[in-house]
Amino acid sequence: MSKAHECINWIKEYFKDNPDGKAIIGISGGKDSTIAAALCVEALGADRVIGVMMPQGHQTDIGDSKEVCDMLGITSLTINIGHTCTVLMDWIAGSLTFAPHNKEYMPDAVTTVISNPMIKTNLPARIRMTTLYAVAALYPNSRVVNTCNRSEDYVGYSTKFGDAAGDFSPLGKLTVREVLEIGDELGLPEHLVHKAPSDGMCGKTDEDNLGFTYEQLDDYILGTGAVDAEVVEKIERLHKATRHKYKPMPTFSPNDFCALPSQVYIDFDK
């Protein structure tokens, strides 16, 4: 059985006890959301998949997102998060300017906030995930789709509590190479499946930002080819620096007070 059919069956199994539930998925127009949405449609039917487009102001490739929704025949919503991001950043800047007992005075707090790369990248991603869960609340028993893949996860190329969140992850254990193979197997348009992935904000591709290609990353993860030592060093450094994104939250337990924080996690099975 192909990986595509295995994944479709897995989604069916996930929803087995939730026969009326819908899959709520953010549609960016990139390969991951396109392929994850197509898998959900194959598993559940188009009437049980809701695509949510969330541009931040003007999105140059919004046409790709609309094409995905039209092609799959799914209900689509467009919610522009641009104003929300701007207002929230303004309020954060204002709080820094006038906060009592703030020992780090910021004379130009607005510039400090809007130019901070962590805020510029991660705030929109978290607002998008908040939006998806708000939409999910409108549809009883719906579940939010995580669209991250194994390659991105390995080097932490996602936002904690942003696109790294969700209720179920069809692509989380598949490398970019395997995701592309599924997209081709499903017969999805090549310009969507093989579109160069980017964050849609800085004008650079993911590979430009990472400093190596997904082919190199997948070769390293799967052990399928020689990878330059400098690239290996970059991959390992990113993996170690971002492991906190995927570890369970360290949680104090009175019975385990001698354990190190990194050894104490919530165990929901107990």
Task: List PLM regions with ranges.
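Short, surface-exposed alpha-helical segments at coil->helix boundaries
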Residues: S33-A37, I62-K66
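ATP/NTP-dependent adenylation/nucleotidyl-transfer catalytic domains that generate, transfer
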Residues: K3-I25, L39-E42, D47-I50, G57, ...
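Conserved G/P- and acidic residue-centered "switch" motifs that form tight phosphate/ATP-binding loops
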Residues: G30
